């Protein structure tokens, strides 16, 4: 991992790895093959792994950890103090709250929101834990303090406020299990 100081920033700009008008903390740590678009804000104590692509207008707050081989689309917001695993895709306007753990191979489509509150609208002490291999439809909302099990599909505009079981398709407000996920529906196994 590198630390982004003044000299490193000059090198990155020279190689066109960084776009224009970024506000990046001097202690930003990053791996190889980093690409950063324009108009991003990366605050102190943020780390990203190898082969990470950050688009435009992204905000990464303190304590954000991003693994390898991730794609962070434009207007994504991380509230900080969260962990994002390897091979995770966060599409346009996704919000990752504090106290969220996202394991490997998860896909968040546009506008997905994770919430750092429990049912009583109080900040929860328990993390939102998203296990590996799930797919989240546009504008779905995932409440804090629950676990999304492995290989789930969460439908567009779903509101998930309870733990899920592995390999299920969930939709609705509140979300409920509709059926089992088929093997050919697992996004990360597609060519």
Where are these regions (language model features)?
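Flexible, glycine/small-residue-enriched loop-and-beta-strand segment within the central core
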Residues: 1-30, 35-147, 173-174, 181-182, ...
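Short helix N-cap motif at coil->helix boundaries in the Bergerat
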Residues: 162, 179
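Conserved G/P- and acidic residue-centered "switch" motifs that form tight phosphate/ATP-binding loops
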Residues: 154, 172
């Amino acid at each position: 991992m590198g630390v982004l100081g003044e000299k490193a920033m000059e090198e990155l700009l020279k190689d066109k790895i960084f776009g224009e008008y970024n506000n990046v903390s001097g202690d930003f740590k990053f791996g190889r093959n980093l690409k950063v678009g324009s108009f991003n804000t990366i605050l102190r104590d943020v780390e990203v792994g190898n082969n990470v692509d950050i688009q435009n207008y992204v905000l990464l707050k303190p304590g954000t950890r991003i693994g390898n081989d991730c794609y962070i689309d434009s207007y994504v917001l991380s509230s900080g103090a969260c962990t994002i695993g390897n091979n995770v895709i966060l599409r346009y306007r996704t919000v990752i709250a504090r106290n969220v753990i996202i394991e490997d191979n998860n896909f968040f489509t546009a506008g997905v929101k994770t919430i750092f509150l429990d049912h009583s609208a109080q900040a929860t002490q328990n993390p939102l834990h998203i296990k590996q291999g799930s797919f989240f439809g546009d504008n779905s909302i995932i409440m804090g303090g629950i676990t999304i099990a492995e290989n789930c599909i969460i439908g567009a505009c779903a509101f998930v406020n309870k733990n899920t079981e592995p390999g299920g398709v969930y939709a609705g407000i509140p979300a409920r299990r509709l059926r089992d996920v088929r093997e050919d529906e697992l996004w990360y196994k597609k060519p």
